[in-house]
UniProtKB/Swiss-Prot annotation:
It is an enzyme of class 2 (transferase). Disulfide bonds: none annotated. The keyword Disulfide bond does not apply. Pfam families: ATP-gua_Ptrans, ATP-gua_PtransN. This is Creatine kinase U-type, mitochondrial. SUPFAM superfamilies: Glutamine synthetase/guanido kinase (SSF55931), Guanido kinase N-terminal domain (SSF48034). It comes from Homo sapiens. Residues 45-131 form the Phosphagen kinase N-terminal domain. Residues 1-39 form a transit peptide. Belongs to the ATP:guanido phosphotransferase family. GO terms for biological process: phosphocreatine biosynthetic process.
Length: 417
């Protein structure tokens, strides 16, 4: 169980104020940090919102599409209970206009309350990014029953590896763009303590980045087990690389088939992976491991951030809901050269990345293919969508090998909840 001062550090903001009443002026000054927030607010009042509104005329991201001068004026002086502001939410999207053909989200959350305090901007961004899901009227569903999956065994002449991942955030602690060093270390302590309770094929150990040699780190990165220091401007502009590698690390079981990343883009990333095409087995391990991790977290007096509108709360709005990305490394040397490939992926609600993941190129016709959506569909629905979609891509590749024509599939319809 977390100690009294640790729980004080991570209490929900409303409770934190009450708890601090008897904690002394030093603790109050350290934990609440009111002066910088007040000073920033006073500086903004010297100028009207119109003078502070960012120049977004050349931007191609979801934030820029929905942040009108009126919305900015309405939200710019608001803060969450921990002091997170609208300008901090949008700074990464202001600094990174985006690619003409790739529309990014362009904003991040600093804590759980961000999505409520700045809902006038986040809700339309979420609706655009998640295929029409309206968080004002719809509810998200969770389903981790792997027995519902149909098929799930890919032809391994095409599929090289299978993987399912998600993220989870510890309630009461700021998200990575906003967390202090103490909060980040508290996330690590809470998570590692819980993971020590995993048994059987899930049992393993934790490795701190700060205690690894460069050779050990690089080997884990090359094997696609470990995250590297963020270099993407989208992440660095959001403040997610601060104090690197303090309180970051990886936990994995003995077989390296179940992994937890700690304090990368989110508090945790939970990953099930293996070589080959047995997606059903990967998802079964994922569901079993994730349920056990949540049980161990709750057993120690903590819980994950979640609500019925947005599902599981994570740093980037693109990962809300399930936070789930089910993907494969797949060889598509012919289909990838076909002009219809992007439209096929779009209609199947799939996205492609390079062989090494986001911001990398494809090598030898090998792509990382995964689900595009996270919110509004359950985990089971998304994994089944990937299974059906990847099988369609394999069928297209086979047809092209035989010199036959392929067709663009009917678009996947978004299920309303």
């Amino acid at each position: 169980m977390a100690g009294p001062f640790s729980r004080l550090l991570s209490a929900r903001p409303g409770l934190r104020l009450l708890a601090l009443a008897g904690a002394g002026s030093l603790a109050a000054g350290f934990l609440l940090r009111p002066e910088p927030v007040r000073a920033a607010s006073e500086r903004r009042r010297l100028y009207p919102p119109s003078a502070e509104y960012p120049d977004l005329r050349k931007h191609n991201n979801c934030m820029a599409s929905h942040l009108t001068p009126a919305v900015y004026a309405r939200l710019c002086d608001k803060t969450t209970p921990t002091g997170w502001t609208l300008d901090q939410c949008i700074q990464t999207g202001v600094d990174n206009p985006g690619h003409p053909f790739i529309k990014t989200v362009g904003m991040v959350a600093g804590d759980e309350e961000t999505y409520e305090v700045f809902a006038d901007l986040f809700d339309p961004v979420i609706q655009e990014r998640h295929n029409g899901y309206d968080p004002r009227t719809m509810k998200h569903t969770t389903d981790l029953d792997a027995s519902k999956i149909r098929s799930g065994y890919f032809d391994e002449r095409y599929v090289l590896s299978s993987r399912v991942r998600t993220g989870r955030s510890i309630r009461g602690l700021s998200l990575p763009p906003a967390c202090t060093r103490a909060e980040r270390r508290e996330v690590e302590r809470v998570v590692v303590d819980a993971l020590s309770g995993l048994k059987g094929d899930l049992a393993g150990r934790y490795y701190r980045l700060s205690e690894m040699t460069e050779a050990e780190q690089q080997q884990l990165i090359d094997d696609h087990f470990l995250f590297d220091k963020p270099v993407s401007p989208l992440l660095t502009a959001a403040g997610m690389a601060r104090d690197w590698p303090d309180a970051r690390g990886i936990w994995h079981n003995n077989e390296k088939s179940f992994l937890i990343w700690v304090n990368e883009e989110d508090h945790t990333r939970v990953i099930s992976m293996e070589k080959g095409g047995n997606m059903k087995r990967v998802f079964e391990r994922f569901c079993r491991g994730l349920k056990e991790v949540e049980r161990l977290i709750q057993e120690r007096g903590w819980e994950f951030m979640w609500n019925e509108r947005l599902g599981y709360i994570l740093t980037c709005p693109s990962n809300l809901g399930t936070g789930l990305r089910a993907g494969v490394h797949i060889k598509l040397p012919l289909l990838s050269k076909d002009s219809r490939f992007p439209k096929i992926l779009e209609n199947l609600r799939l996205q492609k990345r390079g062989t090494g993941g986001v911001d990398t190129a494809a090598t030898g016709g090998v792509f990382d293919i995964s689900n595009l959506d996270r919110l509004g569909k359950s985990e089971v629905e998304l994994v089944q969508l990937v299974i059906d979609g990847v099988n369609y891509l394999i069928d297209c590749e086979r047809r092209l090998e035989r010199g036959q024509d392929i067709r663009i599939p009917t678009p996947v319809i978004h299920t309303k909840h």
